Amino acid sequence: MNIPRRKLLALLVLAVATPALGQQRKAKQRVVIQVSDNDPAKWTLALNNARNIQSDLGKENVDIEIVAFGPGLEMMKSESKVADRLAAAIDANINLLACQNTMQNTKVDKSDIYGGVKFVPAGVTHIMKRQREGWAYLRP
């Protein structure tokens, strides 16, 4: 069997490229959502956006972070008006991140924040880092 070099090269390229294309399709989507308003309606919108993204793409196909800083940190407190929604978000593997700069400046202790919330040194910087890493950015 005599296969011309061009056909052999084309088959080789196809064999190597096909698995790579499959891996690209399976790559997880990543989105970081900013909430910097002390407004239950904005928080509800952000949480709804996160759940809708999971519903559309599949929970296993997307990483979601909601970063709260400035006045938005108030909604991450244990007694906030959206505390029940925070619990549902955490249960759905949505990462809730509180800005420690805001906490320090407003004298909020980690014990004041809803259980399951994680902490980042600086919310704005964390969002910038995620954008550099290729994460999609939303601000409802």
Where are these regions (language model features)?
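Secreted/extracellular ectodomain signature
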Residues: 21-140
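N-terminal secretory signal peptides and thylakoid transit peptides that target proteins
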Residues: 1-15
